[in-house]
Amino acid sequence: MNRRGFMSAESHYLNALEALDEGDRERAKAESKKATSLDPEHLEAWSVYVEACLPPAPTPPTMIQAAQALAAVKKIVAADPSRMDMWVRGGRLMADDLGML
């Protein structure tokens, strides 16, 4: 927290990581969204958001979950085209879950 009592993007990101580790995907999604609202270029927070949008394996995501994850993947790749992990994740979401290929 900063001097005014507001949490930083990094604090929200760390809370999101903790929530994801605990299996609380909704809280992870909310915390990572707060982090990216404060810092839209926080690519690791966007990565946590991608993971939080998707159910744990082997459960397939719903169309809404896959679309939310893909939207975040696109933001990451736009900011850092070298993120091969996100190119692969996006391709799998499009082909396997959204039936776009």
Predicted regions and their residues:
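Structural signature of tandem alpha-helical TPR/SEL1-like repeats
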Residues: E22-E31, A57-K75, D97-L101
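Short, charge-rich amphipathic alpha-helical segments embedded
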Residues: K34-P55
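TPR-adjacent "capping" and linker segments in tetratricopeptide-repeat scaffold/adaptor proteins
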Residues: M1-S11
